[in-house]
Amino acid sequence: SLGASDLSERSFTYADRPADQPDFELVHFDIEAGDQELIPLLQEILAINPALKLMATPWSAPAWMKTNQALVGGRLKADCYPVYADYFVRYLQAMRARGIVIHAITPQNEPQNFKNDPSMVMEAGEQARFIKAHLGPALRQAGLGEVEIFCWDHNCDAPEYPLAVMADPAARRYLSGSAWHLYAGDITALSKVRQAYPELKVYFTEQWVGSDGEFGGDLLWHMRNVLIGACQNGSQVVLEWNLASDPDCCPHTPGGEARCVGALTLDGEHVTRNVAYYLIAHVAKWVRPGSVRIHSSTEALPNVAFLTPAGDKILIVLNEHAEAKRFNIRHQGKTASVSLPAAAVATLVWT
């Protein structure tokens, strides 16, 4: 997150100031504010896997830039559009100075969510104006034009929002695509937007697993709707939210989501692997960067298939039924029969 998310210990930005002391020159910008562990952890992760690509999004602009002077709700003030674009530039530059390259950003996490802690409302017209007149030009002027911008970053119930942003030609020239969550709506919304603008990418960027759920049911739901569903509807990325939490689903802000289970639960030296871990494990090891989705019939069991750069074929299949199901794989004149246990998912690989 660019600044605090609702899963930070407290709400903050990198340019917090009293309301009566605005900082339009960002003299007090401080990338070390807030989560002290974040930058060292990202550096350690990138040392292990330098090829990892990172995406960043803010939950809120600094309060002094907002109409309500608070980190929850409110909108970006019209006279703060330029300095907020500069805020993104300063963040990207500060992270690069620490060896952390951010490959993509969204202007606002969940821009129609006014209740989260932190949060900020940004309607489609506002986002288009911010991108075309401020954020996009600021990135290019700073030599950061290769950083990809994705609009929206919210639910599948409002495809009209990203479509409105993309319909503005001046905004679209800076866009790489749209980002999506699935706390409302249907995953097929991704296809609607992709069909309207096939030259733009679709990324699925967030879905959390609740602590009040049940492992088996949650795994099947996320596999069907998020991993298989997003890929079948054109997404090139699937991100689960979030990486890790403690047994009490902490940290989170006082008004943030208190039920979000990380992919890993960390309890001292003990690590528990949860739904998001196994969901990603079914695909990440096999579907390597550069893989492409290939056709597969979906009438019997939900599935998605890929062709890897090495020529391997990957098929991820879900059986939500209460009994085992047998299915056939037909490829280049050859057939294999596979039995998948009840309420199970499998990843099949062949060359």
Protein language model regions, located:
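Glycan-recognition and catalytic regions of carbohydrate-active enzymes
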Residues: 265-311
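Active-site neighborhood of glycoside hydrolase catalytic domains
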Residues: 83-104, 111-212
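C-terminal beta-strand-rich structural cap/linker in extracellular carbohydrate-active enzymes
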Residues: 339-351
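N-terminal catalytic cores of secreted or lumenal carbohydrate-active enzymes
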Residues: 1-103, 123, 133
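Aromatic/acidic polysaccharide-binding cleft in carbohydrate-active enzymes
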Residues: 201-279, 295-296
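Conserved, mostly hydrophobic/aromatic
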Residues: 54, 105, 178, 230, ...
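Short acidic/His/Gly/Ser-rich catalytic and metal-binding motifs that mark active-site loops
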Residues: 7-11, 62-69, 111-116, 158-161, ...
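Carbohydrate-binding surface patches
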Residues: 285, 296-332, 343
